[in-house]
Amino acid sequence: MAKKSKQLRAALEKIDSTKAYSVEEAVALAKETNFAKFDATVEVAYNLNIDVKKADQQIRGAMVLPNGTGKTSRVLVFARGAKAEEAKVAGADFVGEDDLVAKINDGWLDFDVVIATPDMMALVGRLGRVLGPRNLMPNPKTGTVTMDVAKAVEESKGGKITYRADRAGNVQAIIGKVSFEAEKLVENFKAFNETIQKAKPATAKGTYVTNLTITTTQGVGIKVDVNSL
């Protein structure tokens, strides 16, 4: 614990808490100040000036990062017949129907993404209390309720991320790993930022992005200059 505290202090000394950095500077600092003993995840956290209580100001969706996330997702698909075969060919880790529902109800959760064809949602709905709180429930807005299961599986395996604004207007997302080249992290950030900017509700007033930080697992939050975006 003492060693970790020392590493944290060393990281804090390299970051000016009163300064907002450019994206390039923030990414470089995130890599430099990372002290985790593993390949830490790099994340962005936005605070948006939106009122999620209003239906037209709820932000939720999915996108594929140009350089991936550095993580291999375990994909579960609820489908039957030809669609089940398509999912298997596309590389889904688990494909099934009632058998998977029973397994999940028994406590099994060794997967990262859940995809379902529309006709399977009545069955999947039984898992709402399990999947919902973990943000694993299939949803058309994130492309996880679809007839094109092959595309959904391939995207999930190829760097697809989902995002959703919470009650306070906060949106968090993974943009890669510390082991990524800085340029690739910046590219991923810019792609995600473009998505967030395009998602701005027409009825949102004032400054849209009020705060933005980049951080690593166990790392220190580095403030990004929103005016430089």
UniProtKB/Swiss-Prot annotation:
Q: What is the role of the protein in this entry?
A: Binds directly to 23S rRNA. The L1 stalk is quite mobile in the ribosome, and is involved in E site tRNA release. Protein L1 is also a translational repressor protein, it controls the translation of the L11 operon by binding to its mRNA.
Q: Which InterPro entries match?
A: Ribosom_uL1_bac-type, Ribosomal_uL1, Ribosomal_uL1-like, Ribosomal_uL1/biogenesis, Ribosomal_uL1_3-a/b-sand, Ribosomal_uL1_CS
What GO MF annotations does this protein's record show? rRNA binding; structural constituent of ribosome; tRNA binding
GO biological processes: regulation of translation; translation
Q: In the UniProt record, which is one GO cellular component term? A: large ribosomal subunit
Identify the HAMAP family for this entry: Ribosomal_uL1_B
Q: What is this protein called?
A: Large ribosomal subunit protein uL1
What broad taxonomic lineage does this protein's source fall under? Bacteria, Bacillati, Bacillota, Bacilli, Lactobacillales
Q: Which key words are in the record?
A: Repressor, Ribonucleoprotein, Ribosomal protein, RNA-binding, rRNA-binding, Translation regulation, tRNA-binding
**Pfam short name (any one):** Ribosomal_L1
Q: Which family does it belong to?
A: Belongs to the universal ribosomal protein uL1 family.
- Assembly behavior: Part of the 50S ribosomal subunit.
